[in-house]
Amino acid sequence: MATEFIKSCCGGCFYGETEKHNFSVERDFKAAVPNSQNATISVPPLTSVSVKPQLGCTEDYLLSKLPSDGKEVPFVVPKFKLSYIQPRTQETPSHLEELEGSARASFGDRKVELSSSSQHGPSYDVYNPFYMYQHISPDLSRRFPPRSEVKRLYGSVCDLRTNKLPGSPGLSKSMFDLTNSSQRFIQRHDSLSSVPSSSSSRKNSQGSNRSLDTITLSGDERDFGRLNVKLFYNSSVEQIWITVLQCRDLSWPSSYGDTPTVSIKGILTLPKPVHFKSSAKEGSNAIEFMETFVFAIKLQNLQTVRLVFKIQTQTPRKKTIGECSMSLRTLSTQEMDYSLDITPPSKISVCHAELELGTCFQAVNSRIQLQILEARYLPSSSTPLTLSFFVKVGMFSSGELIYKKKTRLLKASNGRVKWGETMIFPLIQSEKEIVFLIKLYSRSSVRRKHFVGQIWISEDSNNIEAVNQWKETVINPEKVVIRWHKLNPS
């Protein structure tokens, strides 16, 4: 009985407080509503709201957020505007015309220079690396008719789009005309060593000028032809301009017929190699390409980059029939012609790596000091993983291995590795015919070491630079002789 009496008393107290609270809130709200004529929020009657008695809460939360002076609470809906979508048919955006970058200015100046002394002739678009003047699919020409009012000229790396300048029906005769090429200076380079070589007269024993192509040659004596290119470096905008002119006296297998389709593939041996390709031409004694490729490359990278050309047949089947290469460290800001000797494609991987070595004969201490300084033109990895390189050195006396040492393993950066290590090899009076065998290896984290190339340092070496370095070292004791050496694949 006592328990039920206490419950009824407590319930009456709470119920009474709740009714008083509801009555006071309803009275305040009715007094506030007439003061706001255009209230945008409608509140349902308090009788429909179930107010649960809670300890410590004196009023409803939503009602406490209403303005105390009865101001209108607006509800604003944001206005949405349609965004502008650039039409796809607009091929020359107006904002590009306002861009006067160094690359665009250089391209415009170059175009004016080429067009200043042009002659009427076939209109070759040399700035388009994939331009094909005579090889256009009939199906594409029907579906996409040519539009003469818009021309897009571009290089392979830099986007150099600009309107075609008026008055340029052909190319500059001073740059691309080969009819007077005999009167101009052409520097001929060996494709392997990139050393200028003399052009000997092609005469037989009777002194006639009969071409040696009529004589059947075999093996290494055969002439595979020459590739004529034009190069120069624009240092102001850090661009290299490569113009493939023509391929002369090219030989191909007889199974390919009399007129196979030939193209030139170029490679810049950067850490991430850059590839470009000319249009396909019909094979002949002198294949004209006349195509220019523009690439952005920093000046310091020219010391470590080689330019490799591969001559490929497209029909009757795709195959590399010749290759040639040259170093870019001697590239000039003046435009120069190069004639590269084409060699047969190697069946093994071509090694373009070079190693800088220093030698010193210390006669007082009876020892030879060998310095492994630096390597360049290193091959890049086909995977995202960076290759590391090291050098192994072996000292031989009379054909027997006496000492062997190696450098530490270092990662390549921009195709270069700098060791700067010095190795000491003691000498004994009985030791004769000293020979050093130096090998370069690469290693990745997913496979074993891989042989890159090697060089013999001795007076009997097959490398002229190695022979000269060894002779100078022996003749001049205590003198450090430093030379760059191109590594051989075997």
UniProtKB/Swiss-Prot annotation:
UniProt entry tagged with the keyword Mitochondrion: no
Keyword Repeat found: yes
InterPro entries membership: C2_dom (IPR000008), C2_domain_sf (IPR035892), C2A_Tac2-N (IPR037786), C2B_Tac2-N (IPR037788), Tac2-N (IPR030542)
Phosphoserine modification, residue list: S83, S156, S168, S174, S211, S218
Disulfide bonds: none
Ranges for region Disordered: 189-215
Motif extent (Nuclear localization signal): 447-449
Gene3D superfamilies, A to Z: C2 domain
Entries under Pfam families matching the protein: C2
Localization per record: Nucleus
Cellular component per GO, a single term: nucleus
C2 domain span: 223-342, 344-471
Phosphothreonine: residues bearing it: T214, T216
UniProt keyword list: Nucleus, Phosphoprotein, Repeat
SMART domains assigned: C2 (SM00239)
Highest rank taxon of the organism: Eukaryota
Residue stretches of biased makeup (Low complexity): 192-211
PANTHER family assigned: TANDEM C2 DOMAINS NUCLEAR PROTEIN
Protein name in UniProt: Tandem C2 domains nuclear protein
Higher taxonomy: Eukaryota, Metazoa, Chordata, Craniata, Vertebrata
